[in-house]
Design a protein with these regions (language model features):
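Mid-chain, well-packed structural core segment of small domains
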Residues: 58-91
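Non-catalytic interface/targeting segments
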Residues: 1-54, 61, 86, 90-131
Length: 131
């Protein structure tokens, strides 16, 4: 799966989704993860709505997007493109997030991750027996 990280340096998630100048892109599976590059956001004049839509289009093909903050309209535009937005609220090293994701993928992924990856979430409970 492809993951985008809002980052000023490619080392940590440290930018707001709508204010970052670049997103660092990683490809990963259960065992490996590699940075495959970055995409830069072109500045310019225009409506905020247009800028959000341009960012969402730029990240098509990603499964997840990490940022420190993201507004509701921006998150909705990502979700409409089947991209799950995730917030860190504090600066977090990208490698730490990758390792957490690997752990989740090798275990029982939480429902939001299973859905984002197109997997059917496994049951986490046993149905009650009928009396």
């Amino acid at each position: 799966m492809k993951i985008a990280f809002a980052s000023s340096d490619g080392l940590a998630v440290n930018r707001h989704f709508g204010l970052t100048e670049s997103y660092y892109l990683w490809e990963m599976d259960r065992n490996t993860a590699i940075c495959v590059g970055s995409v830069s956001v072109e500045g310019g004049e225009g409506e905020m709505e247009d800028k959000i839509l341009a960012r969402a289009r730029m990240l098509e093909g990603c499964t997840l997007v990490y940022s420190m903050q993201i507004g509701g309209p921006a998150a909705a535009k990502l979700v409409a493109r089947h991209i799950q937005p995730l917030k860190t609220t504090t600066e977090v090293p990208i490698r730490d997030l990758i390792e957490k994701l690997k752990g989740a993928l090798n275990g029982r992924p939480p429902p939001w991750l299973a859905k984002a990856m197109g997997l059917s979430p496994e049951r986490t409970f046993e149905p009650a027996e009928e009396e």
